[in-house]
């Protein structure tokens, strides 16, 4: 008897057949091997310029013998610490294996295939679209304005009574744009009542003035808002995969019910607790990022690049020459940044803010490659 083929289209859900997976930035090892380089700088994935907090490193060493244990269900110590950090009720907080897990759970909990749609801007963080389509949902997008600010009229026009979730990232990725909080208030009040407004604030720590840009402190006035945050950026825990949502309490309860057990492992939880306590490291991260962002913006502008204003830990820019040529020339010099073709921006690039030496190497390499202004 012949074994059934696993390549038949009817063996998987239709949504999977043409599914395009998330494409991460190139790794240091890939570029070392490709070009035979000993020293490679990665400025592609918006990671912490200072690495990992020394307090977190000591905690991981001290707690390593707990690796055989399961974390406590729901990570109550961590959710209480996050709640205290933001001044919200612990019942609002759901921790996840990166904020990606919270995005996935929100879509699967709130949206019904064949009925609901999901709305976001174009371009946007690709996970919104990937998970919406994987769940068999219609995914709608509103274009940004030519200057990459948010066209809220187009965004609201894309929604209707069947919109389960409207996603916005602020500061935005890849542009770095961060709208004033008054605009978010207007949208929250104007969206259809049944629509959940999910504000992804992965980069909010870097904006400089959260009160002017975030609704997190005003959630009681907006029952249709969920806010996402991450430990990957200012806390320096990208490799441990730890994020969280601050949600309406009833919705948070549903997510706790359906999430996979122990998705936040015990060492990630201990690292998150330590990171919240290390305010010195976080403050230094924000200082280094602000200084580096200004240095990179000034350097690129002097080289004739069109530099987008940024409130995040990265800068999007358009070079005066072909973006792919610059990207590849930087790779040959051992510097990895992010091409934005996958975002529909083939002539733009995104560079993460690194430490002072990494930023200097990037600008010096650009000076060698780009025609002098």
UniProtKB/Swiss-Prot annotation:
Keywords recorded for this protein, A-Z: Amino-acid biosynthesis, Aminotransferase, Histidine biosynthesis, Pyridoxal phosphate, Transferase
Question: For this protein, what is any one GO molecular function term?
Answer: pyridoxal phosphate binding
**Membrane listed as a keyword:** no
Pathway(s): Amino-acid biosynthesis; L-histidine biosynthesis; L-histidine from 5-phospho-alpha-D-ribose 1-diphosphate: step 7/9
What reaction does this catalyse?
A: L-histidinol phosphate + 2-oxoglutarate = 3-(imidazol-4-yl)-2-oxopropyl phosphate + L-glutamate
Coiled-coil spans are none
N6-(pyridoxal phosphate)lysine modification, residue list: 233
InterPro entries per the UniProt record, alphabetical: Aminotrans_II_pyridoxalP_BS, Aminotransferase_I/II_large, HisP_aminotrans, HistidinolP_aminotransfase, PyrdxlP-dep_Trfase, PyrdxlP-dep_Trfase_major, PyrdxlP-dep_Trfase_small
A Gene Ontology biological process in which this protein takes part is: L-histidine biosynthetic process
Cofactor(s) for this protein?
pyridoxal 5'-phosphate
Q: Would the keyword Repressor be found if you checked this record's keyword annotation?
A: no
Read off the Pfam families from this record: Aminotran_1_2 (PF00155)
The protein's enzyme class: transferase
Q: Which PANTHER family match?
A: HISTIDINOL-PHOSPHATE AMINOTRANSFERASE (PTHR43643:SF3), HISTIDINOL-PHOSPHATE AMINOTRANSFERASE 2 (PTHR43643)
- NCBIfam families tied to this protein: hisC
Family, similarity comment: Belongs to the class-II pyridoxal-phosphate-dependent aminotransferase family. Histidinol-phosphate aminotransferase subfamily.
Query: What name is this protein filed under?
Result: Histidinol-phosphate aminotransferase
Taxonomic source organism: Nitratidesulfovibrio vulgaris (strain ATCC 29579 / DSM 644 / CCUG 34227 / NCIMB 8303 / VKM B-1760 / Hildenborough)
Gene that encodes it: hisC
